[in-house]
Amino acid sequence: MVGDLVAKLHAFAEVGQVILTRNIPDYDEVVAAENTLIIQNTSPKGFGANHNVAFAHATAPYFCVLNPDIELPANPFPALLAALNSGSASVLAPAVVNSAGRPEDSARHFPTPLRLAAKLLGGHDGRYVLIPTQGPTPVDWVAGMFMLFRAQDFKAIGGFDEQFFLYYEDVDICTRLWKAGRPVMVCPQMQVMHDAQRASRKNWQFMKWHAASMARYFWKHWGRLPRRSVS
């Protein structure tokens, strides 16, 4: 799976460098290729820490955070880069759908206790309704499975907060970008595929990480969410 994704990325003219982090030794074989850097961790790091290390090796004016289980039916980068270059967004994401073509919850409103309670009771879960014909649209936050940053803005904001081991690091960095006046947007016209693995609903350790990250996010941003929370 990872090898196929790396090969596909190298086929895109817009991709000048691929940085792959082996956090645990269970990836399939990735054939060494020009402009591919493989970082082998001696012990597992968190999501944010891994991407901060990767960014330290990145040389391009754009930095893409990409999960290895993302599938790219078409090259998303021409449209995404054109949208970044023509607007003010600091980070841009495509719309994410599952294998059945149904939208994933990859662009959402900032979490609040009220919104979380509504979700638990079967109400609205905070996701945006994205229309494929829409142009780039401001949203509160986009999921870390696919985030295309302006490298200068990622650096200026200090990258991911490594105190989030797993979960909420994407919400946190988008919150900090909005607070700094750096917009977060999604491009509904461009779609990628992802089948979410809700590990936090199945594994006790992931549940603990999820709860700890949620608590840290609310402690860090409680009462201090950006004034510009888009509807």
What are these regions (language model features)?
Residues 1-12:
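Short, well-formed alpha-helical segments that are part of the catalytic scaffolds
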Residues 20-29:
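A conserved acidic beta->alpha catalytic loop
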Residues 111-140:
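Short, flexible, basic/aromatic active-site loop/helix in glycosyltransferases
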Residues 140-158, 162-191:
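A short, conserved alpha-helix in the catalytic core of glycosyltransferases
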